[in-house]
Curated annotation (Swiss-Prot):
Molecular function per GO: translation release factor activity, codon specific
InterPro entries assigned to the protein according to its UniProt record, in alphabetical order: PCRF, Pep_chain_release_fac_I, Pep_chain_release_fac_I_sf, Prokaryotic/Mito_RF, RF-1
Keywords: Cytoplasm, Methylation, Protein biosynthesis
UniProt lineage: Bacteria, Pseudomonadati, Pseudomonadota, Alphaproteobacteria, Rickettsiales
Basic and acidic residues compositional bias, start-end: 284-293
Residue numbers bearing the N5-methylglutamine modification: Q236
Family membership noted in the UniProt record: Belongs to the prokaryotic/mitochondrial release factor family.
Region (Disordered): 284-313
Name of this protein: Peptide chain release factor 1
PROSITE patterns: RF_PROK_I
Organism: Rickettsia bellii (strain RML369-C)
Length: 357
């Protein structure tokens, strides 16, 4: 984006903001008022950043002009030169802030999320690691004040999880957690290891935006719903009614099975919630892939097939391989203190997008 088009863009945004302000003050009502109010609210953040940027630019121009005054004494000149240096230092940061606010928004960022964790290679140790990851995200949600609800859980005999999913509700949850999708690897000495050897195992994390009926319409004709008796460990039936539910979305082949609740109705409701999220994410993935093909580049660092992070317990370190960030704070991270990684991943994503402008 060249300087002229960047400046023109800012002028247009400020103009639109003023027009919306006048429109809202003119006494409009109904749907027109709702639409204008939303547009106005959506622009408030970027307008505030543009005004700060324009103010700094104007102050810099004024200071440079004042510096040319022949009657200035030495002390005043030094004061002006210091002000110019400070303004010149702040402008790139303010400009970057504006450009980031101008980046196309991911429509899913404001949504709540569904997180799914599956034990990967490593047997029982992988299942224990999956449980530890699940607890880590649950703790992170608590620290953020988000609502955390377990949707389904498939436990092993010694406290591990073969597979587990949860709904995390709150503002901008998906924007924070979307970069957690991928293969997480752990290196540690299992409690059952008598020789003290380090084992490596893995778990897969998938983060999906939680969607409502308005986002994904599920037609009855597109769904195949099977019911069956819930079974426990070893395959024995734990319920005398057909409370377990399996729903298949015929057009995509996506299937969700749930048996956690004793009520078939509750299992169906939870299964539909997960199904909507998976279909929505599949549509997002296809759109991302189309954009990637158009630009002849790979999009998205959340590819679930790639190893994204390693948790090394003997060394007390956690390494994110996408951004080459290593923190020697494994206890804090496992206890839900993820912001340092999450903020770095968001900044990395913004930098990539800015380089494409």
């Amino acid at each position: 984006m060249n300087i002229s088009s960047f400046s023109d863009n800012l002028t247009k945004i400020l103009g639109k903001y003023e027009d919306l302000s006048e429109k809202l003050s003119s006494g409009i009502g109904g749907e027109e008022f709702v639409k204008a109010s939303k547009e106005y609210a959506d622009l408030e953040d970027i307008v505030q950043k543009i005004k700060e940027y324009n103010k700094a630019k104007a102050e810099l121009e004024e200071a440079n002009n004042f510096k040319q005054e022949p009657s200035l004494d030495k002390a005043t000149l030094e004061m002006i030169e210091e002000e110019i240096r400070n303004l010149e230092d702040s402008l790139p940061t303010l400009e970057r802030s504006v450009k980031i606010a101008l980046l196309p928004k991911d429509e899913a960022d404001s949504k709540s999320a569904i997180i799914e964790i599956r034990a990967g290679t490593g047997g029982e140790e992988a299942a224990l690691f999956a449980a530890k990851l699940f607890n880590m995200y649950q703790r992170y949600a608590e620290l953020k004040g988000w609502r955390f609800e377990i949707l389904s859980i498939d436990e092993t005999g010694i406290g591990g999880y073969k597979e587990v999913s949860a709904s995390i509700k709150g503002k901008d949850v998906f924007s924070k957690l979307k970069f957690e999708s991928g293969v997480h690897r752990v290196q540690r000495v299992p409690e059952t290891e008598s020789q003290g050897r380090i084992h490596t195992s893995a778990a897969t994390v998938a983060v999906l935006p939680e969607v409502e009926d308005v986002d994904i319409k599920l037609e009855e004709k597109d769904l195949r719903i099977d019911t069956y008796r819930a079974s426990g460990a070893g395959g024995q039936h734990v319920n005398t009614t057909d409370s377990a539910v399996r729903i298949t979305h015929i057009p995509t082949g996506i299937t969700v099975a749930l048996q956690d609740e004793k009520s078939q109705h509750k299992n169906k409701a939870k299964a539909l919630k997960i199904l909507r999220a998976r279909i929505y994410e599949e549509e997002r993935r296809k759109k991302d892939q189309e954009r990637a093909n158009n630009r002849r580049k790979q999009i998205g660092s959340g590819d679930r097939s790639e190893r994204i992070r390693t948790y090394n317990f003997p060394q007390g370190r956690v390494s994110d391989h996408r951004i080459n960030l290593t923190l020697y704070k494994i206890d804090e991270v496992i206890n839900g203190q993820l912001d340092e990684f999450i903020e770095a991943l968001i900044a990395n994503d913004e930098a990539k997008k800015l380089s494409d402008i």
